[in-house]
Amino acid sequence: MESLRSLSNISALHELLCRYSNLSGTLTWNLSSTNGTHNLTTANWPPWNLNCTPILDRKKPSPSDLNLWVRIVMYSVIFLLSVFGNTLIIIVLVMNKRLRTITNSFLLSLALSDLMVAVLCMPFTLIPNLMENFIFGEVICRAAAYFMGLSVSVSTFNLVAISIERYSAICNPLKSRVWQTRSHAYRVIAATWVLSSIIMIPYLVYNKTVTFPMKDRRVGHQCRLVWPSKQVQQAWYVLLLTILFFIPGVVMIVAYGLISRELYRGIQFEMDLNKEAKAHKNGVSTPTTIPSGDEGDGCYIQVTKRRNTMEMSTLTPSVCTKMDRARINNSEAKLMAKKRVIRMLIVIVAMFFICWMPIFVANTWKAFDELSAFNTLTGAPISFIHLLSYTSACVNPLIYCFMNKRFRKAFLGTFSSCIKPCRNFRDTDEDIAATGASLSKFSYTTVSSLGPA
């Protein structure tokens, strides 16, 4: 009986050691890593020979062909959409002089960083995961990791800059005109690239290729971060979580929240104008909500406004009716545009958290409890988390540019030279704030330029 227990314990230990000896090359962890591994695995592990083939065949089957092809197709679709969308944005913004505005300068920088995310992150994440081996060498390992982190950082900082610029243009239009110039925008963009380049230097220093024994007795390679201590690793991921997710997320929530509040006030203003216009048909004097003379606080006061009957008597009833109808229709169009803007702002904030929160949480979890995170996220979960973060590179062009009517017209004017109406387009009331419109509480007609068409 004792001998049977001993054999059972030996068998369990044998299986455990065989599992740990083959953990390498199965998981991508770091935001900029391309083929991570668990700390328990070393090049000489285990220090004695084990015949693990039967156990591996029985306990650790290879991924199904369906799972493999699903991952390839999803990565390919996101990659193509990101490259195609961001390339089109760069071409349109560079070739069209009418779109060279302050906010569009940030959008151009955002498109460049998103294009880098697609080109530098996705291939060097997918290929090593499929092959379970990093085949590109030490130089590519360091360079790819560095530019991955750089592109993600620049993209995040650009989103923050866009939210601050839009907030200033809408909520503090007079003050923002003093400093909102293209030269100032260029300096901010340059600062985001320089700051991101400095922040991501640890990827150049600590990213290395590490060898490990593969299942077919070949020597494999992983591109991974090798930290001098556990404390340094934890501090690094907490830093990334703070400056690339937590602070940008809070800034975007506050900025777009204040913009939504200002637009809601504009909606109330337009509704009061509609009521006043309809009441005027019956010759009734109604209180009209108008902005106060104080540009700083955004308050509104009630002012009783009576039409001059002598002035109105010079107009025929048919002319008055047409003017009132046009005024009401125009006001309702502005009202709908503002509501679309608010919905779009909610989508922007939601997509930022949906795309980036999982990867930052996974990286921080891995830094503090690597074994637990490894067991939970191995395989499909971590692949999906990385894919979700890369989705932002193809979502940003849709939200910030292709939902803008003026940009769509500029796109057609750039690539459809045979269609004259597309080349000679005019501005509309539904242009986005990226068109550089001067937004003011006193002129709610331009606020609708923030939203999609």
UniProtKB/Swiss-Prot annotation:
Q: Got any disulfides in this one, which pairs?
A: C141-C223
Q: Which SMART domains match?
A: 7TM_GPCR_Srsx
Lipidation positions, renumbered (S-palmitoyl cysteine): C401
A GO cellular component annotation here is: plasma membrane
Tissue specificity as recorded in UniProt: Brain and stomach.
Which keywords appear in this protein's UniProt record, sorted alphabetically? Cell membrane, Disulfide bond, G-protein coupled receptor, Glycoprotein, Lipoprotein, Membrane, Palmitate, Receptor, Transducer, Transmembrane, Transmembrane helix
Q: Name one Pfam family in it.
A: 7tm_1
Please tell me whether the keyword Cell membrane is annotated for this protein.
yes
Topological domain, Extracellular: which ranges? 1-64, 132-142, 206-237, 365-379
Question: What are the TM regions of this chain, as residue ranges?
Answer: 65-94, 105-131, 143-164, 185-205, 238-261, 344-364, 380-403
Record GO biological process: neuropeptide signaling pathway
Gene3D superfamilies found in the cross-reference section = Rhodopsin 7-helix transmembrane proteins
Q: Where in the cell is it found?
A: Cell membrane
In alphabetical order, the GO MF annotations are: neuropeptide receptor activity
> What does the function comment of this entry state?
Receptor for cholecystokinin. This receptor mediates its action by association with G proteins that activate a phosphatidylinositol-calcium second messenger system. Has high affinity for CCK-8 and low affinities for gastrin-17-I, CCK-4, and unsulfated CCK-8.
- What name does UniProt use for this protein? Cholecystokinin receptor
Please give the organism: Xenopus laevis
Gene field? cckar
